[in-house]
Amino acid sequence: MWLSDVKLILADRIIENGALRSENGVIAEIVESAGQPSGSTVFPGFIDMHGDMIELELEPRPKVDFPMDVAVGHLDARLAAAGVTTAYAGVSFSRSAKDGERRSFEHTSAIIRALKENIQGLRVDHRIHVRFDMTYTDAIAALEGLLVDGAVDLVSVMDHTPGQGQYRNIENLIGFRMRGGKSEEEARTEIQMRMDSALPVEKLLGNLQNVSLLCLAHGVAMASHDDDTE
């Protein structure tokens, strides 16, 4: 099949008016075109390395849950329509989440299972990006279980302790928690508890080393996330 008289966005250059031939879903030939440009553009599929969208698809409003298969199917259609061909679903664990709530061990594991179970029927190459907060020591065991099961494609580490890094402004963080469904009192209490229980640097580095060794052992790429650059 030929796509002719289109603008082609390639890895090393742009062909303003070209033609592309595909065979069995694979690009077989790219040439210049002498025809009248159609105004259409062909570009490589986008890769989304960090998508927060899966959690909102499942729970668009606090305590309003969509069925897993419906949410995953809807997300897949939206990503494909936007030109995203590989999407890393960002999932994480929260120490403040109760059983079954967003970012609890149960909820996050269910998200991963839903993606893995529906993978054959989806348009987009869906992968799992686990974001590990170095302050949450108890989550290491859960992460290890997912790595052993081969359910994780990327791990990033971060420190979301309030008062530094991304959450330097406490009032902004309180507002963010309130938009997620918590009252101001609940948000302030939760944030103060996190600040009071902040881990010493030695413990943070120990958690980082343990997670690094797990990723190395299972051949999973590792990255940093929300670094403090000031």
Can you describe what each PLM-predicted range is?
Residues V6, L20, G25, G39, ...:
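Divalent metal-coordination and catalytic microenvironments
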Residues D12, E55-E59, Y136-D138:
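Active-site-proximal flexible loops/turns
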Residues H50-D52, E59, L214, G219-A221, ...:
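Mobile, glycine- and charge-enriched loop segments
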Residues V26-A28, D226-E230:
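Short, intrinsically disordered, charge-balanced linker/junction segments flanking boundaries
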Residues S40-A110:
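Metal-associated gating/positioning segment near the N- to mid-region
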